[in-house]
A protein has these predicted regions:
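Perimembrane helix-loop-helix junctions
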Residues: 53, 112, 220-244
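Aromatic-anchored transmembrane helix interface
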Residues: 76-87, 96-121, 127-137, 141, ...
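Transmembrane signal-anchor hairpin modules in multi-pass inner-membrane enzymes, especially those
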Residues: 1-91, 111, 121-127, 131, ...
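Hydrophobic transmembrane alpha-helices and their immediate junctions
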Residues: 324, 348-390
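A membrane-periplasm/extracellular boundary helix in multi-pass inner-membrane enzymes
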Residues: 205, 209, 230-281, 295-303, ...
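Alpha-helical transmembrane segments of multi-pass inner-membrane proteins
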Residues: 2, 22-24, 44-47, 121-153, ...
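Long extracytoplasmic/lumenal interhelical loops at the membrane interface
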Residues: 281-295, 303, 307-348
Length: 434
């Protein structure tokens, strides 16, 4: 990649900004909603690459791309790690002779490369992203209310594979809205503050309606990141005001709405299930079955540490463990290990786990380096970016969230968009927006 990316035509900035906004607008509110925005970003990224190769005369390019920050070691490292995750996943699938369907999620890490590179060469319209994010959460909350109040579902699941990723992604997007509202409040942009705070409330409602217990694990992490980025005297009053409104609204939902009572019962049941497993060996409940699946995987991983087990091979091996009485039979009914890290370690070995952890850690660290930047926009975008890998690490403790198309698309698109937006804001802060 060139150190100083060439400018791209103005229409590509519009196209990529629209693709990013549509990704957040449709991610949880439309069937396969991730495909529309993600497809636009991929096509736009390829078009930017092509125009960069074909353009020989700088005056033909629009100046909208001139303010993009130069490529650094950080950019190249993120691209290399995305490529490494793809390569090791492909190697493991081919080595084990697994079905081609297990290449699906891995290929998306490869396709994220032109998206990331393209976004780094245009000017993202942050106001479009904010509107897409807020409107996406409004429709998500509406769908959650419709499913729980009129369709009769016990847990809102939107149009994704289950209630768990629905709640997790709603929480993440809601946190981003809250951070955006805090930034807008410090700039006295009250209309934007109201819009984004309402989006955060909508995301919180959708998370509660999903009754996702794994989401709670991420909350302390998000709170710490927000505190590091925003706890300055000038930000304290709007931040505390927004948090107070959010906490009050959450308490009202939990105390008065049926979906709140159901969520509370789910959280309390987790402790009962833990006691049933630890004291009575009951592996038939949600908590016990997950722990038994982890036990089976951790028994098996040392036998094939480098590239792990093929899916068909492991299913046969698991039945052998059950027959030998080492694992409870109920573990054999689960579709996966319900842990992102163990799942990768089991089926891609230590190589796959190292590549995946490296991507999470590098992304987290690169964003965290800007949490105390002088410019508030850079700090807020850094906080939102750092929240992505850390929240997904927390979500991955109890589910294979990146084993689903919606989960991996949300993660990769958000990583590319937030990284490009933060680097753009960083450049603007250095040059005065020139």
């Amino acid at each position: 990649m060139p150190n100083h990316p060439a400018a791209s035509p103005a229409w590509l900035s519009t196209w990529m900004s629209a693709g990013a906004a549509l990704s957040f607008l449709l991610m949880l509110s439309a069937p396969s909603g991730y495909s529309v925005g993600g497809g636009m970003l991929l096509l736009g990224g390829l078009a930017i690459w092509w125009t960069g190769r074909c353009t020989r005369h700088p005056h033909r390019a629009d100046t909208s791309g001139q303010a993009s920050a130069p490529w650094t070691v950080e950019d190249r490292t993120l691209c290399a790690l995305l490529l490494a995750v793809f390569a090791i996943n492909t190697l493991a699938v081919l080595w084990h002779g697994d079905s081609g369907k297990y290449l699906d999620q891995g290929v998306r890490y490869l396709l994220a490369l032109p998206v990331l590179a393209g976004l780094r060469r245009i000017r993202l319209r942050l106001d479009w992203l904010a509107v897409g994010l807020a409107l996406g959460l409004f429709t998500t909350a509406g769908i959650a209310a419709w499913q729980t109040r009129w369709v009769g579902l016990a847990r809102a699941e939107g149009f994704v594979t289950s209630a768990i990723p629905f709640g997790d992604m709603a929480l993440t997007m809601g946190f981003w809205c809250l951070m955006g509202a805090a930034l807008a409040a410090t700039q006295r942009r009250w209309a934007w503050t109201a819009l984004l705070l309402a989006g955060s409330l909508a995301g919180t409602y959708a998370m509660i309606a999903s009754a996702s217990r794994g989401s709670l694990v991420a909350l302390p992490i998000l709170a710490i990141l927000a505190a590091i980025a925003l706890l300055r005297r000038v930000h304290l009053r709007p931040l505390l005001g927004g948090v107070a409104i959010l906490v009050a609204a959450t308490a009202i939902v939990l105390a008065t709405l049926p979906v709140g009572h159901f969520a509370e019962s789910r959280y309390a049941a987790a402790l009962d299930e833990w006691h049933a497993y630890s004291q009575q060996g009951d592996a038939t409940n949600n908590v016990g079955s997950r722990l038994e699946a982890w036990k089976a995987a951790l028994i098996s991983i040392p036998e094939r540490p480098l590239l792990g087990w093929g899916h068909a091979q492991y299913n046969t091996h698991l039945q052998d463990l059950i027959s030998a009485g080492r694992i409870a039979p109920f573990a054999g009914t689960l579709s996966n290990t319900h842990n992102q890290f163990i799942e990768i370690w089991l089926h891609q070995g230590s190589l796959g786990l190292i590549a995946f952890l490296s991507l999470l850690i590098a992304g987290f660290w690169y964003f965290c380096r800007r949490l105390r930047a002088p410019d508030p926009t850079v700090r807020v975008l850094a906080c939102c970016g750092a929240a992505l890998p850390s929240a997904f690490a927390a979500f991955g403790l109890t589910q294979v969230i990146l084993g689903r198309n919606n989960g991996v698309m949300f993660f990769l698109v958000s990583l590319a968009v937030l990284w490009a937006a933060m680097r753009q804001a960083e450049r603007d802060a250095e040059t005065g927006g020139a």
